[in-house]
Amino acid sequence: MKTLSELINTTDPAWPLIQEWLAEAANPVEILPRNPAAAESELIKTQVTTRSVMGAVVYETGGILIDHGWLRILGSGSAKLPRGLGSWNIGRTQAEPAAPAPYYLIADDAAGGYFALNGGGLDGIPGNVFYLPPDTPEWEDCEKGYGDFLHWALVGDL
């Protein structure tokens, strides 16, 4: 497993890009405050660097609520969204931190649907975000990677 210092990218972090997207947001957005210790712990569990959009969301936020909480993007966890990205997946999609996962739960919506990053276990392109609606057992390919999914959630028509 990579150490925290290996996961924190100070030369080319993705957070400034996310801040640009936040400034363009067409939907109401609430960035939940992070707890530094939880952010570090969740980043280690995910093993994703802050150079990636996912790593930056985990490390810089307690989560992101879009459209008054209609869509909830997992970060490092907070009082309003008490689930960290890494912790939420352990026991659900992974046996332990950094273990391979068929998919990785990244967000959910108020209707009861789940969004997951395909780790190769869903029928479709690995790395794409998939949606599991509450009324069907079929995962649907959103045809976007994590970064494009977050950008769509912020500026697109939900």
Model segments located where?
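A surface-exposed partner-binding patch
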Residues: 1-122
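Compact, glycine/acidic-enriched structural inserts
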Residues: 125-158
